[in-house]
């Protein structure tokens, strides 16, 4: 490859960019926090990094998921089989689903208000790193 022999300085940025692209499509997930719903844990307008390879999720994990065509960031407060009380009614979280809330309860639109309060595992894009 004569092109790279004469321009080796191009090889490192090109390979680095390709590696980053592969990582972002397969392992990492770049997210954005558009509201104050996760403050003080995550500040409004901050970028966050998640992993697509997250294994088992547990209560307390912060996830990035899709709902109604939007990406949201919330904390898992109950998992499949657990009971939650919402508006005085006890709900059992279905298997492979999660009940989520924002850390800033006064500024979060989350499972407490949705007509279908559960996030299906198939909608989860990533788990927050860190």
Task: List PLM regions with ranges.
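Extended hydrophobic leader/signal-anchor segments used for secretion and membrane insertion
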Residues: 1-130
């Amino acid at each position: 490859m004569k092109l790279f022999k004469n321009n080796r300085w191009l090889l490192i940025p090109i390979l680095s960019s390709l590696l980053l692209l592969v990582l972002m499509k397969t392992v990492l997930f770049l997210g954005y926090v558009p509201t104050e719903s996760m403050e003080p844990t995550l500040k409004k307008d901050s970028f966050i990094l998640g992993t697509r390879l997250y294994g088992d999720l547990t209560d307390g994990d912060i996830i990035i998921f899709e709902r109604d065509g939007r990406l949201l960031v919330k904390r898992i407060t109950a998992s499949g089989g657990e009971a939650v009380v919402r508006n005085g009614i006890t709900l059992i979280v279905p298997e492979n689903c999660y009940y989520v809330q924002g850390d800033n309860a006064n500024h979060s639109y989350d499972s407490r208000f949705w007509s279908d309060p559960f996030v299906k595992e198939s909608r989860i894009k990533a788990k927050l790193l860190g």
